Amino acid sequence: MSDVRLRFAPSPTGYLHVGGARTALFNWLLARKQGGTFILRIEDTDVARSTQESVDAILQGMEWLGLDWDEGPFYQSERFPVYREFVERLLAEGKAYRCYCTPEELEARREQAMKEGRKPKYDGTCRDLVTQDADRPFVVRFRAPHEGVTAFDDLIKGRIAFNNEELDDLIIQRTDGTPTYNFVVVIDDATMGITTVIRGDDHINNTPRQILLYEALGYPVPRFAHVPMILGADKTRLSKRHGATSVMAYRDMGFLPEAMVNYLVRLGWSHGDEEIFSRQDLVEKFTIEAVGKSAGVFNPDKLLWLNHHYIKESSPERLAELLVPFLRERGVDPSTGPSLPQVVKTLQERSRTLVEMADGALFYYRSEISYDEEAAAKHLVPGTLPLLASLAEKLDACADFSHSGLEAAFKEFIAEKGIKFGQLGPAVRVSLCGGTASPGIYEVVEALGKDETLRRLRRAVAYLEQ
């Protein structure tokens, strides 16, 4: 295993968002490509908003996507003593100081700066205080340099530089003794030996402050890669108003994990004109430098196209297993009807999602299918009664109920009757499936089996005889 170490560090304040999932994927792929270590860390310092339910949802989303982690999950809430040690160390070294300014004082100074057209930032009132008052509430601030430039070479965005005079003296510990995000993320990444930080580009402005903390603590600065955000079709940040944003919502909508992985990685990264990538392809071909600088637009139609591809490519046995809960939601027990893998085989070419497949499979498992009124009125007419009755007799005598055997039997029947397939096919579809939109007739008959096929044909004959 190489020394490369990457991490995904979500906050457990909600579900695993598609943007977070893509960030996790990029980290996972780079770790796997370089033979490194992928670490999962839960950033739960916001105790009021963090929930176990969210932790469970994040872990479930990671597992569904197949993003296995090598270390963790680590929880920041369990590391508070570690953070306090580093705060004390910075205080002892004069690299941090206690600030006694009240929120009211800070707000007044902020408003004054705005009035004067200055950028609001901490004015350093307590930066060089000689006397300390342990009885007064205080925060701890990092003593940032006010001169020079802090720059880094972003693996996606290129060189980014900040004038240090623009940077605040960052609060690293609140009045209640809890550490702040920008501080703990540095301590965690430093002590966990993270070598590359891949995260959303909303963190770019945090980076110079974090680099200064690394340097003050004497730790090597990792490489940074800031991933552009994901937008909705209207070019605004992807949110619930654009549709589902939770990874697990897409699972529940009948998407396959490999389709979601393929889609999310391609949303911002490319390798020539290729669209379809297996997991192994992605591990071999992915580079963070090939991620685009501009935001990606989430396209549900493209995801549907990919999902359809993977449904067509998957084994019927695997899809059957995944389909069971969708059928049960619809009141169907698939163990009571035809072979589910056989049914799946008839629906793979037509189904873009497992939801569509489950809906398309219902007629196989309902003993008393209802006929579509328009289709029945058009195709279940008196003239088809003798044809359906004769077909039932023909199939009853058919010894080979395989696809090829059924095709031969139907062709023979049509020739015997001197008709065209179009005069028979729609009536058979309505009889067996309830409507004319269905898989191929031979596939349906083969999946239903002889007994059920004959029962449905004879039921249609009885319907016509009424």
Swiss-Prot record:
A GO MF label: tRNA binding
Alphabetical keyword list: Aminoacyl-tRNA synthetase, ATP-binding, Cytoplasm, Ligase, Metal-binding, Nucleotide-binding, Protein biosynthesis, Zinc
Cofactor(s) needed for function: Zn(2+)
Cellular localization per UniProt: Cytoplasm
Catalytic activity as recorded in UniProt: tRNA(Glu) + L-glutamate + ATP = L-glutamyl-tRNA(Glu) + AMP + diphosphate
Motif 'HIGH' region, chain ranges: 10-20
Residues engaged in binding Zn(2+): 99, 101, 126, 128
Record GO biological process: glutamyl-tRNA aminoacylation
Enzyme Commission identifier(s): 6.1.1.17
Subunit details: Monomer.
Name the record gives this protein: Glutamate--tRNA ligase
Source species of the chain: Geobacter sulfurreducens (strain ATCC 51573 / DSM 12127 / PCA)
Gene field: gltX
